[in-house]
Amino acid sequence: MKIALLQLEVLEKNKEANVAHGLQLAAEAAKKHDLLVLPEVWTTGYSLGHLEQDAETQASPVLAQLAEIARNEQCAILAGSVPMRHADGKIYNTSAAINKNGEIVNLYDKVHLFGLFHEEDFFAPGNNFQAFTLDGLCCGSTICYDLRFPELFRHLAL
C-alpha cells in the first residue's frame, strides 16, 4: 500500500484558495497512491472566528470533489478535517473517510478539543468514535489532541 500524506500551506482567511490548492494536490497525489491523508482544518486553518460562514456540511462541494477524486483515481482518502455543521446546528472538527469508490464510509468528530487554542469556543466535541472498514482495512480516526487520551485508542482497538 502506498500512502501519501498531503502537506500544504494553509492561508488564513482564504478558504477558496486553500480548497483549490488542496484539491489540486490531492488529485495529483491520488494518481500514484492507494491512500491519501489530508491535514487538520486544511480548508480554513485556525481562523476559527470565520467558522460560521466557512463550515461545510456533509453535502458540501469539498467532500463531493474529494469523493470524485477517490472514485476517478481508485484511491481512498482520509479527508483530514474540516469544520462541519451537523444537523444539530453545531460545528464540529470533522474527518471524513472516503473509500476508493467515492463513498463516505465514516465521519469522525474530534472528541478532545485543545484548550490552548480555545477550540471549545468554536467547535462542539464529538462522541462518535468507532472502528470502520476502508477498502478492506479496519481503521479508526482521531484528530490531533485526541492522541493524548489513550482510552480512545483502546476503545478503537477493542
Where are these regions (language model features)?
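Extreme N-terminal starter segment of soluble prokaryotic enzymes
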Residues: 1-5
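Hydrophobic positions in the central parallel beta-sheet of the AAA+
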Residues: 6, 36, 140-142
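Short polar catalytic/cofactor-binding loops
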Residues: 7-13
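Catalytic metal-binding/acid-base residues of hydrolase active sites
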Residues: 9, 42, 82-83, 146-148
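Hydrophobic side chains within alpha-helical segments
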Residues: 10, 21, 37, 149-151
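Cys-nucleophile CN-hydrolase/nitrilase-fold catalytic domain and related Cys-dependent amidase chemistry
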Residues: 15-16, 23-100, 107
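Conserved strand-to-helix beginnings and helix N-cap segments that scaffold or border functional pockets
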Residues: 16-19, 153
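Active-site catalytic loop in hydrolytic enzyme cores
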Residues: 55, 68, 86-158
